[in-house]
Amino acid sequence: AVIAAQKKRLGTKRGFIAVKSNCSIQSYVPALSPFRADFGLDKILVCTYQAISGAGKTFKTWPEMVDNVIPYIGGEEEKSEQEPMKVWGRVENGVIVNAEKPLITAQCLRVAASNGHMAAVFVSFDKKPSMDEMKARWAAYKGRAQELGLPSAPKLFLRYFEEPDRPQTRLDRMNEGGMQISIGRLRPDTQYDYKFVCLSHNTLRGAAGGAVELAELLTAEGYITAK
């Protein structure tokens, strides 16, 4: 519906613009999506720990980041709070209307990792699921890419680790070619219902790989066709 309205506005027959969401939300938005319909998301606090490749840098080109953490990424906190509302929104008359809930507050830090964005998530629900229900939802969740069997889509989209020290950036960012979301450390919280940690590969899932998957989706849905 958005693409059709966009083509009408632009006056194009075939061409259109498709965008993907910011790399900072790639881990925690998929991890929370399985619960929206049945449990409702009330409020979320998220702290992201983002690799230097997200700034287009390496340790060679950004030596100041070696053995360092910078507690500021320009514009990232605003995007991390606002973009999920668009992702979880609805389309009306060719326009995306943002979701009204959940309330989101974010803090984004640049850390000394080459690739991989990690997020510490605190969440409260309208209707609180059990921890077993959450793990079961993660294991069973399929996005549109899995339903269509797209070439770049991970077979298991969301993977939960029972080990207390997982996921780890070095060990888990390349799971399923860097396209899988890794989740761990689910436990009750004193201020929110639960807290957990999740990890995504920011330049694969969050950027280039996600863009390829988007092109595959648009092709499968008939928006991109051969001349």
Tell what function each PLM region has.
Residues 25-26, 78, 128, 205-208:
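Loop/helix-junction capping segments adjacent to catalytic residues or to phosphate/diphosphate-binding pockets
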Residues 1-65, 69, 101-103, 175, ...:
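N-terminal Rossmann-like NAD(P) cofactor-binding subdomain of oxidoreductases
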Residues 42-48, 52-195:
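C-terminal substrate-binding/catalytic lobe of Rossmann-fold NAD(P)-dependent oxidoreductases
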Residues 22, 125, 198:
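Conserved residues at beta->alpha junctions
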